[in-house]
Amino acid sequence: MLKCHPGFNTKLELLKYGIQFVYFIVGLGFHFAVIKVLHKKWSVYSKYPFLKLYYVDSILSVLIILLDLVLIRVFNYIPPLCQWVLQEFPEPSQLISILFIEQYLQFVKSLIFCFMVVNRANNVICVKSFGTIQSCIIPHVIVFCILCPLLGVWTAFLSDSRFVPFQGGFIHETMMEYHWITVSQFSVIISSITIVTVCICSVISMLCISRTHAENKHTEQSLTASALAMSIFYVFALSMNIYCQKAHASSLEMLEFWKALTAFAFDIILVCPPVIMLCLNVRLRINVFSVDTRPTSPK
């Protein structure tokens, strides 16, 4: 039977979890505030395809954060649970594979952001009428982003998985019973596609942001600035993910260190986007932090 790593200080591991708990709760507060405003004034904000996609992205972030708070990070950072769980699940089980829902949601979130930056690039280089076309295809884009990641995770869901020690706790690992691309390999593919798309579209947006074709130029420029700011964090987090998946760590401790650092990098793109949106979009910020019932545009 697998054994938990000895030597991890319970108080220190609980402190690590506590720090993550705090910034996740803060992030949830911002997400719920923005989602509430977007939903309440949907007739106004739904005119912007970017905000439709951001609405979905924010919901995905909430789901991932809740999953991390309740299960994933609890398993990772609370040593007393390690031995008990390894005793309860001494053998691989398909029940454990349910935890791969986190990776699936991360893949969906990355693809959604790809289309968010594509929207911004289209906005600065295409004619005004293209916005109507974008609004029509957004539902199809969302369906595509939801279904596409299943190509990389269906094997994990259908295969048995097991718990393996990780720092003071443990993580889940699939036994991979099918001859297909692994979750790690698919993660590298999705991350690479996202990084390339984000970099290309961000360069286009930066070069052409002053030539935005829209009636509400200030609104469109603020949304583009928000996408550019988020892009920095996405490129950083996904680059870390690729390095962690492809690099060969010299020791188990280094492997665990890079996995923990990669998880923290992804935490940034879970928590920061609503803060960025509120900082760079005046009308959205006003609607969130004050009583404002007028149907105005999200500057």
From Swiss-Prot:
Family per similarity comment: Belongs to the nematode receptor-like protein srg family.
Disulfide bonds: none
InterPro entries named among the record's database cross-references: 7TM_GPCR_serpentine_rcpt_Srg, Nematode_SR-like
TM spans (from-to): 18-38, 59-79, 98-118, 137-157, 189-209, 223-243, 260-280
Name of encoding gene: srg-30
GO cellular component, one term: membrane
Pfam families: Srg
GO biological process per UniProt: sensory perception of chemical stimulus
Membrane topology: Multi-pass membrane protein
Chief location: membrane
Protein name as it appears in the record: Serpentine receptor class gamma-30
Highest taxon above the source species: Eukaryota
Subcellular location: Membrane
Keywords noted in UniProt: Membrane, Transmembrane, Transmembrane helix
Organism annotation: Caenorhabditis elegans
Example of a GO MF term: transmembrane signaling receptor activity
